[in-house]
Amino acid sequence: MPVRSLSSSVVVWPDRAAVESALRLWAEEAARIPELVRVGYFGSYARGDWGVGSDLDVVLIVAGADLPFARRPVAWDLTRLPVPVDSLVYTQDEWRGLDPASRFARVLAREVVWVWPPGERVVA
């Protein structure tokens, strides 16, 4: 979360590099769970226009899921990250089935920065 300087009233919010590094470390540990297929982020941190109070929008792709879409994020503890997190958890089939004509799918296609597996750039 934010860090207050001891000699100032200025609040310093974690920058993109710090947040991405923390997410990469989280993803490496979470990858021990075989259902996890991909981890990425989008939104203000991906676009570079984050600021004090910005959250991290995370997308997780999993092999399959028993929980309904709205309840899946509770299964993934992202509280160790240095900023608040809003997460979306899609199965591979749901991710592939996103309507490419929808505004949200276009935003995801344009913005998602994949951090796991290493070197991953796109999800087919």
Residue ranges and their predicted role:
Residues 54-56:
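Short, conserved active-site loops that position catalytic residues or coordinate cofactors/metal ions
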Residues 1-38, 47-52, 62-124:
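Catalytic core of pol beta-like nucleotidyltransferases
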Residues 58-60:
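Short beta-strand->loop micro-motif that forms the acidic, two-metal-ion catalytic signature
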